[in-house]
């Protein structure tokens, strides 16, 4: 067991210096305390740095708090990312997500959520989302969700766009080895008015190594697609990151 964890730590440390092609997608499903009752908190972060001809730093810090009762689950996620070049801040982004889940004795639960992000990494100034939907428990490790969301997005040129979308997501977190889990989260968000040509989607694949009950190391690959991106933005970007999480 100890030998296996040492191998996991070696791989994670080796990947800390992996270049991030874009800011990593925040995985809302990650570290959910579903099925547990009580107050839970977690802190996670990642760092990419290089020194030499060009000094560069890129960090992400995320705080999460869950407050679960017998009938209601609620959680809040706050994240901050920053890029520095030769000591000067060239980009920074922030993310906020709050969600309330109303549980019952069936496998179908209802949820309300709000989200706000400012992310120049993807060429938009801000994006605000409010949604109402349901969450279906497929089995003990897989979930399927659907919601109606209202999106208010403003690009870097201060052009504002409001869109009504469907939000469809699938999440699976299954054990592939002792204390090792493969985490998959997929989101598809088509516009209700333009179902074919205006679609946002993202996929997050992570290998989670549970060092102990409090510490988790995640190796994550994420990909984001937007069929109708903001002006001068690419339709697709990717990121590779190593994340360390502490639960308390």
Report each predicted region and the residues it spans.
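Solvent-exposed loop/turn segments connecting transmembrane beta-strands
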Residues: 49-57, 85-91, 118-126, 156-162, ...
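Outer-membrane beta-barrel "beta-signal"
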Residues: 207-210, 236-248
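Hydrophobic, lipid-facing positions within transmembrane beta-strands of outer-membrane proteins
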Residues: 39-41, 57-63, 94-98, 128-132, ...
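Cleavable N-terminal export/targeting peptides
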Residues: 1-37, 248
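Transmembrane beta-strands of outer-membrane beta-barrel pores
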Residues: 47-51, 69, 80-84, 114-120, ...
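Repeated loop/turn-to-beta-strand initiation elements of outer-membrane beta-barrel proteins
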Residues: 39, 70-76, 106-110, 140-144, ...
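Residue-level signature of outer-membrane beta-barrel architecture
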Residues: 47-49, 65-69, 102, 136, ...
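Transmembrane beta-strands of outer-membrane beta-barrel proteins
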Residues: 40-46, 62, 75-79, 101, ...
